[in-house]
C-alpha cells in the first residue's frame, strides 16, 4: 500500500492504494473522485479477481507517487476495493511507465522513469 496524490484542476487529495501489477487500469474510490470533482466520462465493465463490475471512468490531471508522476490518466471509479481497506488500486497503466523495485530494508517502492 502506497500513498498516492491526485490533482485535478484546483482540487487535490491523497489516498492509500494497493499496488496491483495485475490491474490494467488504476482504480480510485468514490471519495477520491468526489474530492477531485471528477466527472464521469461514462461507464465500462471491468473484470478482476472478484468478477465483473461496472465502473465509472474519469480523467485525472496528475497522479503522483513520490517523485513519479503521470499526467492526464484515465481511472476507474468504484468502491469495491474499499471492502479490503484500500482507497483504490495503483494499476499497470501507471506502474508500467516506470522500472519498479522494492527496497525491503526501507520498505519502499522505488519507481524510476523508463529510458
Regions found by a protein language model. Give the residues of each.
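Pepsin/retropepsin-fold aspartyl endopeptidases
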Residues: 1-115
